UniProtKB/Swiss-Prot annotation:
The keyword Coiled coil applies. Residues 84-107 have a biased composition (Acidic residues). The gene is RRP36. It is found in: Nucleus, Nucleolus. Component of the 90S pre-ribosome involved in the maturation of rRNAs. Required for early cleavages of the pre-RNAs in the 40S ribosomal subunit maturation pathway. Residues 64-73, 119-131 have a biased composition (Basic residues). Residues 74-83, 144-154 have a biased composition (Basic and acidic residues). Its main location: nucleus. Residues 206-228, 277-298 form a coiled coil. The keyword Lyase does not apply. GO terms for cellular component: 90S preribosome; nucleolus; small-subunit processome. One of its GO terms (biological process) is maturation of SSU-rRNA from tricistronic rRNA transcript (SSU-rRNA, 5.8S rRNA, LSU-rRNA). This is rRNA biogenesis protein RRP36.
Length: 302
């Protein structure tokens, strides 16, 4: 040192070394804090953020021992972030932001965690009331296959004889194989009609229920019989046309149109009806015809 020069404390240059290499700087900083001098402001400007951060961590550790470890839990999360920012690879701006971070935010976060008693992320939200709808996270995707409320559940058992996956069912063959069920249906209708006649102690509700079942079974039997009659008429016509074609009396077989099929079926049904049924059908047709005529008259007046 030259003569006449004033003695100055050693200047600490800014550096971004690891915490292990900043022990000497830490000792100088602590010593400089206790010994005031004229160049304190200049020295503080030249101290690295890593050294200041390490010094702050040392002071916090000492304070936590006196307060029973409460301050250590409060600043544990902030210390982890600050230790990462003090590495040599981190930027100076990031270190400065972490260093000047206020302790109010940490205190608020600590109070929130202390009041809840557990991690708020893991805490399950409770329903406001038992009648409130259940809540689910919107971040979890909804499954593609799910049950819809109000619809009937799928049957657990399936009859492969009527399963469309095994091909289209032959209704004529099914009707032929299960035609014996008509006898059971007819017998059931007769038994329910006898109950309605003999049992007079039936309630109004049970009586209406039995009448509805009788009417439903009768209409089902009529539908099956009409379908059998239609199939029978069409098959007989087809056989007749093929016989004429084979005998040579007809050049080509004649295939009926839908309108011709409808007329042929109606004629066959009318022939097989009883007298009372025919009268009802004729009366229904007459009323329908009169209604059409009245509508035409009203339209012509306007």
């Amino acid at each position: 040192m030259a003569k006449g020069t004033r003695g100055k404390p050693s200047v600490i240059r800014p550096s971004y070394d690891d915490d292990s290499g900043s022990d000497g700087e830490l000792a100088n900083v602590l010593q400089a804090r206790d010994e005031p001098s004229d160049g304190d402001d200049d020295d503080m400007d030249s101290i690295s953020f890593g050294a200041l951060n390490a010094a702050q961590r040392k002071l916090d550790q000492k304070a936590s021992k006196k307060k029973g470890g409460k301050a250590q839990r409060r600043r544990s999360d902030g210390d982890r972030d600050n230790s990462d920012d003090s590495d040599g690879d981190s930027d100076g701006s990031e270190e400065e932001g972490d260093f000047f971070e206020t302790s109010d935010d940490n205190d608020q976060g600590y109070n929130k965690g202390k009041s809840s008693g557990r991690n708020p992320r893991k805490q399950v939200q409770k329903k406001k009331s038992k009648h409130a709808p259940s809540e689910s996270s919107s971040k979890r995707p909804v499954s593609k296959v799910r049950d819809i409320g109000g619809l009937e559940s799928k049957s657990m058992y399936r009859d492969i004889r009527f399963d469309p996956a095994y091909g289209k069912a032959n209704l004529d063959e099914v009707r032929k194989n299960y035609s014996f069920l008509d006898d059971y249906r007819q017998q059931e209708v007769q038994e329910m009609e006898q109950v309605l006649k003999k049992d007079r102690n039936l309630s109004h509700f049970n009586k209406q229920k039995l009448e509805f079942k009788v009417q439903s079974l009768k209409s089902r039997l009529d539908t099956l019989n009409n379908r059998d009659l239609e199939n029978k008429i069409l098959s007989e016509h087809k056989k007749e046309q093929l016989a004429k074609f084979k005998s040579g009396s007809q050049a080509n077989p004649y295939f009926l149109k839908k309108s011709d099929k409808r007329k042929l079926i109606q004629k066959a049904k009318f022939d097989n009806m009883k007298t009372s049924q025919r009268e009802k059908v004729m009366e229904r047709k007459r009323k329908r015809r009169l209604g059409k005529e009245f509508k035409e008259l009203e339209f012509n007046r306007h």
